[in-house]
Curated annotation (Swiss-Prot):
CC terms in the record's Gene Ontology section: extracellular region; transport vesicle
Protein name: Mast cell carboxypeptidase A
Subcellular location: Cytoplasmic vesicle, Secretory vesicle
Residues forming the catalytic site: 378 (proton donor/acceptor)
GO biological process, one term: angiotensin maturation
Propeptide boundaries: 16-109
Gene Ontology MF annotations: metallocarboxypeptidase activity; peptidase activity; zinc ion binding
Length: 417
């Protein structure tokens, strides 16, 4: 059975030509009133728009800045309509395919080898996990927490001294396939944590007293697809019953206010919630792991892009969590710490009031499970490159984010029981 599944995946991959995005554009639109919002919503009835920010048409609101991708064929219609209704816009990306190719602006030190300065495909990441085990056997262990619908392994790296039970932080990257800077950070974190142990006082103390569970790529199948077939792919690769559209948005698939957002029940949307809470193998693997380590995990951090934000619960309601003052304090100091490296400015706050309401998110699920320090990073940039952050900005992004994560970890070590 496994052989036939593998052959089906290989056949599918070979049979489908990779998507090209020649002369596709990314627009940024400022919606100043209800009429503007209505015009944009009406456009989606006849033109396919790929929303970059917010994630879907039902999330747009007055006074919001909206980023979306459109085909070359439809871009002139979009421009004419926006100008006709006096809606302010700018074109962030004039040729998406060109921007995709420009993303790889760092040369290989050694061809084909894993690099922290470059984006790495899934095969390189798997090989990297093996090398981390070999290099730091006393500090790193690899746990297979499950597998995907295409039978790829879901690996968590446990970082920390192996003696005894201790506090832990769970971190995941790459829940959305096209957000490549996210897995790049998880790799950087593991590298820096192990490299600086015994040299950096703060990291040494953290690793002596707590563990980090790091899931470098949450959405493995989608990540592979974004490398081989469709750079703009977001969801996983599960098949949907009674629909030819593929995939579920894993960050809408958690069992927390799962069905409260409009239109997330449509399989062809990028924000499709799935047929049931935790229906996806990836979601189930992560939730089972966190439940089984509930006594030790004191904080949860998930990494996304883009927008330069540090978000706290809730997303499904404007109601604030009981310890919101504590969470906001941590977020404020963490973003201040981040800015000390390159003066990169992040905003912070609850998901619902800072960006938009959302349902079924990992952040809210973990918080409601009982882990009361949960954070979501939206990494660089603010939209100029969007999901196509050039490789030359990987290291600066990771270095500044590391400062923020180290502060959060120190706070958790000191202030949780």
């Amino acid at each position: 059975m496994r052989f036939f599944l593998l052959m089906a995946v290989i056949y599918t991959t070979l049979a489908i030509a990779p998507v090209h995005f020649d002369r596709e554009k990314v627009f940024r639109v400022k919606l100043q009133n209800e009429k503007h919002a209505s015009v944009l919503k009406n456009l989606t009835q006849s033109i396919e728009l790929d929303f970059w920010y917010p994630d879907a048409i039902h999330d747009i609101a007055v006074n919001m800045t909206v980023d979306f991708r459109v085909s070359e064929k439809e871009s002139q219609t979009i421009q004419s309509t926006l100008e006709q209704h006096k809606i302010h816009y700018e074109i962030l990306i004039h040729d998406l395919q060109e921007e995709i190719e420009k993303q790889f602006d760092v040369k290989d030190e050694i061809a084909g080898r894993h690099s922290y300065a470059k984006y790495n495909d899934w095969d390189k990441i798997v090989s990297w996990t093996e090398k981390m085990l070999e290099k730091h056997p006393e500090m790193v262990s690899r746990i297979k927490i499950g597998s995907t619908v295409e039978d790829n392994p879901l690996y968590v790296l446990k970082i920390g001294k192996k003696d005894g039970e201790r506090k832990a932080i769970f971190m995941d990257c790459g829940i959305h396939a096209r957000e490549w800077i996210s897995p790049a950070f998880c790799q950087w974190f593991v590298y820096q944590a192990t490299k600086s142990y015994g040299k950096n006082k703060i990291m040494t103390k953290l690793l002596d007293r707590m563990n980090f569970y790091v899931l470098p790529v949450f959405n493995v199948d989608g990540y592979i697809w974004s490398w081989t077939q469709d750079r703009m792919w977001r969801k996983n690769r599960s098949r949907n019953q009674n629909s030819t559209c593929i995939g579920t948005d894993l960050n809408r698939n958690f069992d927390v206010s799962w069905d409260s957002s409009p239109n997330t029940n449509k399989p062809c949307l990028n924000v499709y919630r799935g047929p049931a809470p935790e229906s996806e193998k990836e979601t189930k693997a992560v939730t089972n792991f966190i439940r089984s380590h509930l006594n030790s995990i004191k904080a949860y951090i998930t990494f996304h892009s883009y927008s330069q934000m540090l978000l706290i619960p809730y997303g499904y309601t404007f109601k604030l969590p009981p310890n919101h003052q504590d969470l906001l304090k941590v977020a404020r100091i963490a973003t201040d710490a981040l800015s000390t490296r390159y003066e990169t400015r992040y905003i912070y706050g609850p998901i619902a009031s800072t960006i938009y309401k959302t349902s079924g998110s990992s952040l809210d699920w973990v918080y409601d499970l009982g882990i009361k320090h949960t954070f979501a990073f939206e990494l660089r940039d603010k939209g100029k490159s969007g999901f196509l952050l050039p490789e030359s900005r990987i290291k600066p992004t990771c270095k500044e984010t590391m400062l923020s994560v180290k502060f959060i970890a120190k706070y958790i070590l000191k202030n949780t029981s």
